[in-house]
C-alpha cells in the first residue's frame, strides 16, 4: 500500500477499479499476514509462521526466500499458486484506523494500476452517490476479514501467553551453491506443546486453536518447495535446515506484511 486514502463520494465519484487476475503488485512481497481460518487452505501450499512481538504477533504465510521476491507471482503477473491469501485478495482496499473516533475507515491504494476514472472495471459509487453493489461487497469482505483477523490475534496471544513460540531461522543451499537464510519469524515449540497440561490442551482443542497449531507445524515442510520455486526451473534437491535464533537476532517488529526477511550470502 503506497498511497492509501479514504474512500468517499467526494473523492471517488468517478472512480472505478479493475482487478482481474493481475497480481504484479505483490511481486516484491515475500510474506503476507494470514487469518487462522485460512490455515487449512494456505497450509497445504505455504509455510505458516508467526511474526511480530508481544501483542503484535500475527500468523504469516511465507511466499519466497529471496528478499523482495514473491515466488508465486509469475512473469506475466498471474498467481502461480492454488490458494490466494485474503490479504492479497482484498487489495487495493484496506481498513485504516481513525484513532480519534475509534473507527475503521475504508481506504484504497490510489497507486494501484487498476484504479481509474475511465470506467474500467467496477464503479465505487453510482451517479447519485450511493454505494454500488461492488463497493458493498468489498466492505462485507473486509469486515469479515477484520473479524477473522481479530480472532487470529486472540489465538496468537494464547501462544504467547503459554510461551509456545520460539525464534527460528531457515537456511537454504540454492542451485549454484549460494547460501540463503530466512529470519525474523517464530514457530511453535513442539516439546513445549507436548508438555501442556490436559486442561489447557482441552481448551485449545475446543476453540480449534490446537488444530491451527498442528496445521502450522505441518506446513513447515513447504519451506523446501518454496526454496525450489525461488531457485527457478531446474532447482533440485534444495537442502533445508532449521536453527533456533537468539531473541533479538533478526527478530521481527510490528505487524506488517513483510516480517520474514530473506538474506543471501554467496559461498
Per-range role (PLM):
Residues 1-63:
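Short, extreme N-terminal leader segments that mark the start of a protein/domain
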Residues 51, 58-125:
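Aromatic- and glycine-enriched beta-alpha-beta binding-site module
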Residues 42-45, 89-90, 164-168:
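A short, compositionally biased
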Residues 57, 67-68, 188, 199:
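Residue-level signal for pocket-adjacent positions within structured domains
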Residues 36-41, 84-86, 160-164:
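Short linear motifs in intrinsically disordered
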Residues 95-267:
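A contiguous, surface-oriented mixed alpha/beta subdomain in the mid-to-C-terminal portion of proteins
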Residues 24-28, 66-77, 148-154:
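Short, basic/low-complexity N-terminal boundary segments at the transition from targeting/disordered tails
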